[in-house]
């Protein structure tokens, strides 16, 4: 594999985010636990009234307990109370995208504030930099991947209501046609299929409501509605996974695993008992159109079911299956998608380690042809010494939409949808260079190598190599002492 030289661009960036309101933290869905010791998930103390803090006795190892009504904290763990139950608590770290679970110990950068009966949370991630994709089909672009997600939680009647929104400026900050990403496929631009590009996310990524009611001391029943929203299909969406927290690129397996995370019309209901969650969705399975600023109206004729399992604070697993009716505008035909994933998170002294293994399979039928496409992802991010990150993503994926008509002519291929097994291997690092009580600024870079059938060499080159250099802004990590001072 040829060696690559590139000039590292230096950017001066000044970001001031001072807030006179005390906030705490929680990322797109995660909250870091500074100590590795996992405390049992206790019930809120019946004697603790909302807004109280119970100090442990002098010299005691017992963790501090705080109770602010809807929001309960015990030691290093944060919980959301369901209704008025003293025992039915949801770990905040477990709350993933849509109705997904992730390990409860997952780090979660966020800003939060208690406002009357409401618990308000603000999550965002802003990444900008240079994206260089290698080989004859690669280009170099300056771009920004970003999202902002406010949410609000309060008691309503016998249960707890969560309102969530999510927005992205990518329709304005991605290059025309999408972010360059070698071997990526899915969706369209100007009526043509996107190839070697990742489409921008919609301006409106999620507008949802989730209402959960306790059933006894250990269970709850919930209903989730989103327009747009995320059905019960696939793992935690890639931009919310702690294992991919520093990786700015979508997986090449995105459209075999978690591409339904923006669906214009979703209703999900399910039942959660202790470590298990069983849920089903009725939703619109059509991928968002090229107009990234509107609300789309398509039939809610797709369905899915998912079983999730979280045996302790450091593990979460899911298996799901769904029928998507005509998801692609240019390829009429249904897709039956099956996914399975395992996520692990381990906090340790001055750091955290998050990893995921994900498999997705599309059984597709187009114009009388049947395709079985598989995607495998292994990704991991380790944070160490407070501000340093190393990360990787290794994936193998089947692609059958890589070739245009002129490409097939060049390669002498007559098959309309030839399938190729593609490998992508990303290695990168980042470092926080400036932290305040509210904001964290980091710089980072990664490099990606590929494997592919040699028949693709005339159009992709023998050994293409891609790289990125970026600046990342998000809420800063917080300490427990700072959180105690918040209230």
Residue ranges of each PLM-predicted region?
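Transmembrane beta-barrel strands of outer-membrane/channel proteins
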Residues: 122, 126-130, 163-169, 223-227, ...
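N-terminal periplasmic/intermembrane-space "pro-region" immediately following the signal or transit peptide
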Residues: 23-123, 138-139, 151-157, 164, ...
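Surface-exposed coil loops of outer-membrane beta-barrel proteins
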Residues: 174-308
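Detector for outer-membrane/organellar transmembrane beta-barrel domains
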Residues: 273-281, 298, 308-414, 425
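Residues on the lipid-exposed face of transmembrane beta-strands in outer-membrane beta-barrel proteins
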Residues: 110-111, 124-126, 148-154, 207-213, ...
């Amino acid at each position: 594999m040829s060696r690559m030289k590139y000039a590292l661009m230096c950017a001066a960036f000044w970001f001031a985010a001072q807030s006179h309101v005390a906030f705490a933290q929680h990322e797109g869905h995660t909250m870091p636990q500074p100590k590795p010791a996992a405390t049992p998930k206790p019930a809120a103390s019946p004697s603790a009234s909302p807004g109280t803090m119970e100090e442990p006795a002098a010299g005691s190892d017992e963790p501090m307990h705080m109770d602010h009504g809807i929001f309960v904290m015990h030691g290093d763990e944060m919980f959301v109370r369901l209704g008025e139950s003293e025992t039915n608590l949801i770990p905040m770290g477990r709350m993933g995208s849509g109705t997904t679970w992730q390990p409860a110990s997952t780090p979660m950068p966020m800003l939060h504030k208690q406002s009357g009966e409401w618990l308000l949370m603000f999550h965002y991630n802003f990444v900008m930099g240079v994206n260089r994709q290698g080989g004859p089909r690669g280009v170099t672009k300056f771009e920004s991947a970003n999202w902002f997600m406010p949410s609000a939680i309060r008691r309503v009647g016998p249960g707890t209501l969560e309102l969530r929104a999510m927005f992205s400026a990518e329709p304005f900050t991605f290059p025309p046609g999408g972010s360059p990403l070698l071997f990526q496929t899915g969706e369209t631009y100007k009526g043509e299929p996107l190839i070697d590009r990742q489409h921008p996310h919609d301006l409106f990524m999620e507008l949802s409501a989730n209402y959960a009611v306790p059933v006894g001391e250990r269970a709850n029943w919930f209903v989730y509605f989103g327009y747009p929203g995320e059905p019960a299909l696939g793992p935690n969406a890639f931009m919310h996974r702690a294992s991919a927290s520093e990786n700015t690129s979508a997986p090449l397996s995105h459209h075999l695993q978690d591409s339904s995370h923006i669906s214009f019309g979703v209703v999900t209901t399910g039942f959660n008992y202790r470590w298990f969650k069983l849920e089903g969705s009725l939703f619109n399975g059509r991928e968002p159109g090229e107009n990234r600023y509107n609300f789309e109206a398509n039939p809610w004729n797709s369905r899915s079911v998912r079983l999730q399992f979280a045996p302790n604070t450091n593990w979460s697993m899911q298996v799901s299956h769904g029928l998507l009716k005509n998801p692609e505008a240019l390829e009429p035909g249904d897709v039956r998608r099956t996914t399975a994933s395992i996520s692990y998170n381990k906090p340790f002294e001055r750091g955290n380690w998050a990893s995921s293994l994900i498999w997705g399979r599309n059984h597709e039928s187009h114009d009388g042809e049947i395709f079985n496409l598989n995607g495998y992802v292994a990704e991991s991010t380790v944070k160490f010494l407070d501000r340093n990150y190393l990360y990787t993503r290794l994936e193998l994926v089947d692609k059958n939409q890589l070739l245009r008509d002129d490409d097939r002519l060049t390669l002498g291929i007559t098959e309309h949808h030839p399938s190729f097994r593609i490998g992508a291997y990303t290695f990168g690092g980042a470092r926080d260079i400036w932290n305040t009580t509210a904001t964290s600024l980091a710089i980072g870079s990664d490099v990606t190598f590929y494997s592919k059938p040699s028949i693709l060499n005339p159009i992709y080159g023998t050994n293409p190599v891609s790289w990125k250099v970026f600046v990342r802004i998000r809420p800063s990590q917080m300490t427990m002492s700072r959180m105690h001072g918040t209230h």
